[in-house]
């Protein structure tokens, strides 16, 4: 740096002049650094936004729905597929079309229940999966809308389910011994392989990184679904249809925990 001395000024005055000048230069440099850092942060923010939007666009692409998504469904913590009817028609389909000899069938003791089945594929089913399916059967039954917090659920073998003439669609006669459980009505919801999955909490903890627990409450299902949708989209950086969330939730009002 070249310095010019003003001979009309004292040494102290010359020094003060260059000191003030250097301070102004430092402020300019500091300002430039601050502007650069701010610009870099803005660029990073834009990049993150771009990546997020790209993920959203990717998730918007129409995915092929699995056959079981027309029913209540979940994968147990032991990775067994469990499906249940949503109404008389789908109960009828679950039993007549998808129930196989080695499956385990569930229903509540009270009327107004889905027929749930564990698709065993001939494998031994752990007690945990049986408990989870019983809880799902209870939670997706009319007991939820009636405000009942626990209800009896039985499980049976497929050969105990009899189709008899004169019974309404989705209704079957049950013969023989029933194995009973009395689960609490409670579920959770998360994303499993790009699909909204609503199931007992133990299943969701096993398969989903982020989730919400739900119980019977006083929030309208449609309003709760909007909150759940927002949570899932933010946590999983994905796009999910509101109708998909609505379809997997139990009927009736909800409390989100």
Explain the meaning of each model-derived region.
Residues 1-257:
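Extended, highly charged segments
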